[in-house]
Amino acid sequence: MESTASIVNVVRITYRLPEVKILFNKYLFLFITSSTLIVIDQYTKFMVTLHIPINYSIKVVEGFFNFTHIRNSGVAFGIFSNQNSELKPYLLIFVSIIAIIAILVIFHQTGKNKKIVQTGLVLVFSGAIGNLIDRVLHKEVIDFIDFFIDNQHWPAFNIADSCITIGVMFMIADMFVGDGSSKVSDNTLMK
């Protein structure tokens, strides 16, 4: 009886190995990609802090693109930056942590065939962590990428913001075009 039970356990474990490998690869992708993007984000912010005084610009492309050291105590596009409260930085840190947890839960629940969504979530996760690090260290986010035409400036942003924006674009793209997995299953059902 014991040998039969151990064979059944080996079969169960062997059956689950592909699932474990897929899950491992999914989280390995999250770890490697997000670690790389977070390091790049923090390195660029460190270099800006080291070499560009606050509210000072370095021209990169005349009349179009500068590196401008700006501190944003609010959220995207400087929203809430004029709100003065001692609790604001802590509230934004708390909201960031909740958002990061939600992203991880959604990432975990995302199917193995939803590579576009997984990539989008990894990008958003990376950006959220990058900006959270700023909020914890500085109580504000360091922005420096400044595009403009004449005196019309797009709000300054950073690598983390770019990750969030591109990640959201990936998820929206998946809603419209998908990655083909649902189309394959629909065609299979029709046959």
Question: Can you describe what each PLM-predicted range is?
Answer:
Residues 2-191:
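Alpha-helical transmembrane bundles and membrane-interface segments of multipass inner-membrane proteins
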